């Protein structure tokens, strides 16, 4: 927010849990009151609770599905109501290569991210007539605090699966989101943009 304001923009911070509908309502109501409209939604909230399928608890499965998939659904539901009235909107959902190809030890996470892809395509078909596009980004490995703690051996093995030979920078994912939110992508909807260095083809 400080960086946005420092560059001459208007930014506000609103804390909300995507699993609590009342907090989501408050988020959109406050954003509309303070900023005037809701034009772009990027669904990026997500958690992981990794474990092998046979040992995974129902609670760990449900928590990941509820946050990653149901939270995305709730955010789209509330945002699209406002976007439909103004007949314009850009919805960008963050999926994952795990949702495209699966990943051992991440049955819950992969299921949630695959669900986001199906949700994206359904929302795109329902909302297109109101001038709203809905697309997904599927990142591969990204340089973040989460990936920084991985053992070096794991990171090197992961890089061997990536034709470009490196993890994505956070800016690589941000650039994809900026493109899909822009007028340059006004004729693109219901698509999944893999930003993974060629990991999944």
Could you describe each region identified by the protein language model?
Residues 37, 128, 133, 169, ...:
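Short, small/polar-rich loop/turn modules that mediate ligand/substrate recognition or access, typified
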Residues 136, 159-184, 188, 197:
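C-terminal helical subdomain
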Residues 81, 125-129, 186:
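Alpha-helical segment proximal to the catalytic Tyr-Lys
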Residues 76, 112, 120:
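Active-site helix of classical SDR
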């Amino acid at each position: 927010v400080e960086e946005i304001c420092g560059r001459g923009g208007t930014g506000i911070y609103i804390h909300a849990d995507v699993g609590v509908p009342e907090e989501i309502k408050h988020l959109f109501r406050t954003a509309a009151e303070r900023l005037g409209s809701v034009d772009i939604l990027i669904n990026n909230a997500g958690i992981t609770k990794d474990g092998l399928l046979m040992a995974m608890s129902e609670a760990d499965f449900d928590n990941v599905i509820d946050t990653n998939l149901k939270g995305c659904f709730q955010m789209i539901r509330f945002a699209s109501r406002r976007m439909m009235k103004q007949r314009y909107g850009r919805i960008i959902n963050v999926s994952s290569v795990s949702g495209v190809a699966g990943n051992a030890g991440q049955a819950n996470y992969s299921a949630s991210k695959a669900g986001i892809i199906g949700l994206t395509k359904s929302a795109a078909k329902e909302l297109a007539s109101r001038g709203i596009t809905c697309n997904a980004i599927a990142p591969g490995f990204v340089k973040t605090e989460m990936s920084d703690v991985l053992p070096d051996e794991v990171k090197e093995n992961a890089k061997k699966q990536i034709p470009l030979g490196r993890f994505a920078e956070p800016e690589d994912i941000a650039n994809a989101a900026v493109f899909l939110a822009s007028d340059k992508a006004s004729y693109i909807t219901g698509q999944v943009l893999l930003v993974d260095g060629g990991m999944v083809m």
